[in-house]
């Protein structure tokens, strides 16, 4: 019995010795145990560099990774796997989390640049309006008109003024003017009325100053250009227009919102994000284009952007070429040239062209506030033709030599103003914001 007990004890001792050896061997392979530091707030997790004397601490060369997420129960929720992830991305900028909203343009959250471009949802901002190049000021126009009416011509030259029947006049003081001889008197009448309508709407900065003159071979103004008059085959006594000649004009291409190749217009409005990614210069351009579209609708001018829309049926790239009768001055202002098709002739054929003019107008839902106010004022007064003719009569001495606006055309002008006013109010009701309106 004793021998058996001693054998069992020896066997147990050998097993315990073997087990202890294994544990010692295993313990030697394990790294020393590291204690977690005491819990501290997340902002203290990274060591701080001592500030240099005489100034603030220098900014880190690379952006520091974001602090680890903190568990209020005391300890980091990030694991070694998370630390590996941070280490792998340390050479680049921190990734954007899925929950963080990305910066994009939408109707609900417009970019600051777009918000600054429009106020009240439908009006160009005052800041943009102030950046529109000045064009022709009232004082400049008045001075030029006074000089042109009394100036003597020393040359009449072909070219530089559009149609072959027109001439480029040079005055004794060296200034020049385009002399437009209409195929019929209504073209000169339409151009003169268009100029004064532009003044009535506050758009005169875009339309060259215009004066009327009578062709009189024996008159003082024409005395030195007798030969040129005979070569031009102008009828004695005809009324022509003198408009200020502008050097260094450049062609203008339709901006992207209307550069359609499929005949469909893309509406220009603030709410739809159409102003996204446009530069300041492009926005300033659009301010001028919206005025042009309103002006051409009111005058029923078919010889500018509307003619491009008409040509799309056989020329899908016409919108990528220069727009007729529209140029840019050296200062950047758009110049609305050759408005002979406006009002009189344009009104006679309005039924043919309004299928282009009306959709073009309805593609615009952002306006210059001053222009919109003038339109609404003329709509409320219901006296647009009377006010236009008063302005024309007051500033043009030869007003009686051309027929006044016929009653049917006067009524059509008022109807077009009413249509435009309703469109502005519709845009304001649909896209306007009460704050700032």
Swiss-Prot record:
Record field: compositional bias (Pro residues): 57-66
Reported modifications of this chain: Glycosylated.
Signal peptide limits: 1-24
The keyword Ligase appears for this protein: no
Source organism, top-level taxon: Eukaryota
Location(s) in or outside the cell: Secreted
GO biological process: cell-cell signaling; retina layer formation
Key words, A-Z: Glycoprotein, Secreted, Signal
Residues bearing attached sugar chains per UniProt: 248
Alphabetized InterPro entries for the sequence: FJX1/FJ
Disulfide bonds: none
Chain intervals for the UniProt region annotation (Disordered): 33-66, 88-116
UniProt GO cellular component terms: extracellular space
Secreted listed as a keyword: yes
Stated family: Belongs to the FJX1/FJ family.
Functional summary from the UniProt entry: Acts as an inhibitor of dendrite extension and branching.
Name of the protein described by the UniProt record: Four-jointed box protein 1
Protein source organism: Homo sapiens
Upper lineage: Eukaryota, Metazoa, Chordata, Craniata, Vertebrata
